[in-house]
Amino acid sequence: MFFHLIVTDDCNLCCSYCRAKMFEEEDPAGHSPGTIDETICENLNFPLADLYTFLEKDKDAVLTFIGGEPLLRTDKILEIMDHAPIKRFMLQTNGTLLAKLPTEYTNQLETILISIDGDKDLTDKHRGEGIYDMVISTAQTIRKNGYNGELIARMTIAEDTDIFSAVTHLANYFTSIHWQMDADFTGDFSHRRFAVWSKEYNAGIRKLVSEWVSRIERTGAVPKWYPFLSTTEDLLLERSSKLRCGSGYANYSIMTNGWIAPCPIMVGMADYYAGHIKGADPAHLPEIPIGEPCLSCDIYGFCGGRCLYSNIVRPWRDEYQLVCDTIRNLHDALIENLPRIQKMLDEGTLSMDAFSHTRYNGCEIIP
């Protein structure tokens, strides 16, 4: 089982997609999030012995440190890595403090997801001046210091993102890239130009899929561009998927008070809790399933539902369909290029092993 551990809700940045939205007026959501847990605290606030007892029941557990910015509590991270009865750790970080993490701990991390949105202008516009240079420098430093795990550029994209340019730029520095659209997570649709931009995005995705396949044809290696990687593997194997991030059945989030939510975005949504670390068995957590209208969609087996939180709360109400249109475009673009990949497989210049990757590692897969 995979677990996100929210080490702290505090953060040292105020990115436009995240904390800056606290100051914006929101449109009413389509549905209520239900009962709100008011015992959530800013920092991890339960005995670590309870966490270790919980994890001990699943020797194959994977623990991902998230926040806020988890490295604001490096002390807790080091303590947990020293004493938790598991061997697999991951980290999601904005990169500002990563260079200060002791090398021997950095190099134990199986995967590091580091936030960066594209080139310098785009990243600094949304995350703060100097962030791009800091992230690129930090990524290079940890590699020089012996980090051999997977380093994933984790992008957030919005209306000023040219998806083709942003991804191909980052491909100069990262072999693994994931992007998530800032869409249908808060009630901000009325002051967005998403409907217009999504047409540009869809065209960019079609161009980017073709570029991805061209790179495979030239090199025989599959770039780990996650929205293409996992989905293409399943299309080739004719395999369907539930929610691709794993939330609510393979991937759960441990909040600062010890309660277990199906997803990091669903912090405090008490009606959807899967238990508490004090008494829960990680091997027998209840599944929190996706609901309609996703289940009746003809490409549900490809998409899996995109986002459990959005499916429940409907921040964009009926306009969620615009997001669905981008997913259908992704599906169609991959299907269109699948014969090129199948040809390489048939000729023996490419093997299915080239698509190997870790699922549920913090990449939502469906943007």
What do the predicted segments below correspond to?
Residues M1-F46:
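Canonical Radical SAM [4Fe-4S] cluster-binding loop centered on the CxxxCxxC motif
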Residues I6-C14, E69, G248, C294, ...:
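Cysteine-centered iron-sulfur cluster-binding motifs in ferredoxin-type domains/subunits
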Residues D10-N12, P70-L71, T96-L97, D119, ...:
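Short, solvent-exposed loop/turn segments at secondary-structure junctions
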Residues C18, K125-H126, M266, S310:
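Residue-level signal for well-ordered alpha-helical positions
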Residues D27-T35, F46, E129-I136, Q140, ...:
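Radical SAM enzyme [4Fe-4S]-AdoMet core and its adjacent flexible, acidic
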Residues D37-E42, D124, P282-L285:
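A short acidic, glycine-rich active-site loop
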Residues L48-T64, R73-D184, F194-V196:
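Radical SAM/AdoMet-radical enzyme domain recognition
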Residues I265-P367:
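Flexible mid-to-C-terminal extensions adjoining Fe-S/redox cofactors in radical SAM and related proteins
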